[in-house]
Structure formats: C-alpha cells, structure tokens
C-alpha cells in the first residue's frame, strides 16, 4: 500500500488497526500500568488508583478501543463516558497530567507501532489530558 492509499490515522478504524487492534491496545495498557507501578515520576497518579489495577486496565483498554475507531467496548461494559466528568473524581493538576503522559509516552515507545503512529497517538492523547 503506498502513501496515497494508506488510511489516515483518526479516520474509520485506521488508528485501531495501527495499534494492533485489541491485542495491541491490551499490551499498551499493560505496559502503561506497569510503568505507573514502577516509575518514580508516577507516584502521585499511582496513589489515585486502587492497589488492584485490573479494572482500571480494563476500562482504559475498552475506552481506547472505541476512541481509536475499534469496537466501543467501554460503552458496552460500563456505559457512556465523559472525559471531563470521569477525571473530576481526581485532583488532576499539571504534575499529574504530565506524569500520566510520561507513563503513556514510555508505554507507546515499547510498542511495535510505526514511528508515525507513535507520534500521532501521543499527540492525540495529549489533547484530553
């Protein structure tokens, strides 16, 4: 497939495909929470979560699936979501935002995604953060 026929990230399911579909998203989320658990820069945001991260991981996986153009698993399992409303339950400041993005940046770098998709994904995740 050449550049003129390659789907653009953010259209249809191009981002979902670029992420490796559900298995790729699950690996990204697994790495994200592993980094959050071990990186000293994430201590503040790790404390905002329960000790068992399995539900948080499932919710993030489900959210990212739909957000990237794949199956809307979050809505199926948990109902509708409003990002500002969801985040209102925590005292998120610039330090917490930067820690979350730092964990995600490190997790993205571990993935076998294309360099273009890595840059795109981090930029898009920075918008709601």
Locate predicted features.
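Core of compact, soluble alpha-helical bundle domains
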Residues: 1-129
């Amino acid at each position: 497939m050449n550049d003129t026929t390659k789907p653009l990230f953010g259209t249809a399911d191009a981002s979902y495909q670029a992420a490796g579909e559900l298995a790729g998203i699950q690996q990204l989320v697994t790495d994200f929470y592993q980094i959050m658990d071990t990186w000293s820069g994430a201590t503040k945001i790790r404390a905002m979560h329960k000790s068992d991260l399995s539900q948080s991981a499932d919710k993030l996986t489900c959210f990212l699936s739909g957000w990237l153009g794949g199956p809307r698993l979050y809505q199926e399992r948990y109902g509708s979501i409003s990002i500002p409303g969801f985040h209102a339950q925590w005292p998120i400041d610039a330090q917490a935002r930067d820690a979350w993005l730092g964990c995600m940046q490190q997790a993205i770098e571990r993935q076998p995604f294309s360099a273009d998709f890595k840059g795109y994904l981090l930029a898009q995740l920075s918008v709601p953060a």
